[in-house]
Amino acid sequence: DQTPGGNSSNMFNEMKFTAILNKCRFQDPTIFPCWKVLRMATIDGARAIGLGDQIGSLESGKLADLIVIDIKRLNLNPVLFHPVRNIVPNLVYASNGSEVTTVMINGTFVVEDGRLTSCSEDQIRKEANEAAKLVVEKAAEKYHALNSKVAQMMEQHLI
């Protein structure tokens, strides 16, 4: 599998499914509240991979990594501030990533107005496909030797 269980490399999807699936699994609507899931995707995620001193939050001495989100997009509305705030729940449950207008990595803008500024999408796609082919070629023999249910289904062209 190339990505997490939901077959998506989209962090917004991962946040949503983390919250929803755990509520179902534990049959508890209070488990994994939105603020906690957002924290897991940022500060706690950085800490989990050993980079908490470099990324995960905006602090002096850390890399300036951030995204800007257009909260005027319909799927993120309505936006409430009083008596309750719903920006974090909107991000976790309703965002899909298309609302990201700006991305800064280590203080350098790499996406502005929703467009890549640092590289070409075609080049990224080409390099990703080339890298994937190399990985598959290296793993193919072991993959088939496992004779897993998924491998069998692929051999039968069922998936």
Feature names for model-found ranges:
Residues 14-17, 44, 99, 105-106, ...:
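Generic recognition of well-ordered alpha-helical segments
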Residues 6, 10-13, 32, 36, ...:
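Conserved active-site and cofactor/substrate-binding residues in soluble primary-metabolism enzymes
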Residues 3-5, 27-32, 96-105, 133-136, ...:
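Short C-terminal domain-edge/linker segments immediately following a structured domain
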Residues 29, 33, 55-56, 63, ...:
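Residue-level signal for alpha-helical context at structural boundaries
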Residues 1-75:
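His/Asp/Glu-enriched, well-ordered alpha-helical/loop segment
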Residues 64-118, 125:
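C-terminal cap of metal-dependent C-N hydrolases
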Residues 117, 122-126, 130, 137, ...:
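C-terminal regulatory/interaction regions
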